[in-house]
Curated annotation (Swiss-Prot):
Record-listed ATP binding positions: 124-131
NCBIfam families: PRK06921.1
Gene Ontology biological process: DNA replication
Protein name in the entry: Phage-like element PBSX protein XkdC
Cross-referenced SUPFAM superfamilies: P-loop containing nucleoside triphosphate hydrolases
One Pfam entry name: IstB_IS21
Function comment: May function as a transcriptional antiterminator.
GO molecular function annotation: ATP binding; ATP hydrolysis activity
Family per similarity comment: To B.subtilis YqaM.
């Protein structure tokens, strides 16, 4: 590359121009660029000690978070859920324990992510906020630690896979390889009986055993206790327990006290 060409590029950067935009009709910067600071170039030149230094723009982190959130398969509404939106005032101790455990897990994540006990499970009473808390954890990991998370709602996820087997291999591979896998409502019971066909068990074992062997974290919610998970499948249940035992809360008690959907019923 010639010296003249380098000077031309630097001149374009100083003026916030991009050659591909040179022939376009004049537009306001606000309509042309997502980021007015760097003109969507990811950085800009600043003068330091008489030299022009390329500085990364803060919008790069924002774009990364946006990509992570989009790839997570967490719905737009659930991406808004955080710890600040979770109410513990007046709640039973089990709910407060789940809240504190989940926040502690996020705080500890970087130190434990490669360990055997690097996962979290919130189990028990439906409607107690398990999904909210683990979604808040997933959102926090993506937004502050830039950790890729994949969300898999057990019932809906397997319904989609059953309806399109062409997706199966690619989806299971994503679930195995994700930095963090969030499994929501594992084996959700129907009329008190865990929902777990032989085919579902085979797929879940394949995913969870891979993650177990490779020390890959999971976020797990289920209405079943550890004993219930073990009864469904001992090999699977014991692996989940070993992975999650340091960050495990089982929420038990009266439904009217624990299920937020029943507030005000009596």
């Amino acid at each position: 590359m010639t010296k003249r060409t380098i000077e031309q590029i630097l001149d374009e950067l100083r003026r916030g121009r991009r050659p591909l935009l040179a022939d376009k009709p004049a537009e306001s910067d606000a309509s042309r660029y997502d980021c007015l600071r760097c003109k969507d170039q990811g950085g800009y030149l600043v003068r330091q000690n008489g030299l022009e230094v390329w500085t990364m723009c803060s919008c790069m982190a924002e774009r990364k978070v946006k990509r992570l959130l989009g790839a997570s398969e967490i719905t737009h509404a659930f991406r808004q859920l955080g710890f600040k939106e979770f109410r513990t005032e007046g709640k039973p101790q089990a709910i407060k324990d789940a809240f504190e455990c989940t926040k502690e897990y996020v705080a500890d994540y970087e130190q434990i992510k490669d360990c055997r006990k690097n996962s979290i499970a919130l189990l028990g009473q439906p409607g107690s906020g398990k999904t909210h808390l683990l979604t808040a954890a997933a959102n926090e990991l993506m937004r502050t630690c830039y950790v890729p998370v994949i969300y898999f709602p057990f019932v809906e996820g397997f319904t989609d896979l059953k309806n399109d087997f062409a997706l199966l291999e690619a989806k299971l591979n994503r679930m195995k390889q994700a930095d963090v896998l969030f499994i929501d409502d594992l084996f959700k019971p129907v009329n008190g009986k865990p929902r777990a066909t032989d085919w579902q068990l085979e797929q879940m074992y394949s995913v969870l055993n891979y993650r177990y062997l490779n020390h890959k974290p999971i976020l797990l919610s289920s209405e079943l206790t550890i004993e219930g998970l073990v009864r469904v499948d001992e090999a699977l249940g014991t692996r989940i327990y070993e992975m999650c035992s340091d960050y495990l809360v089982i929420i038990k008690g009266a439904a009217y006290e624990l299920n937020h959907r029943l507030e005000g019923v009596r």
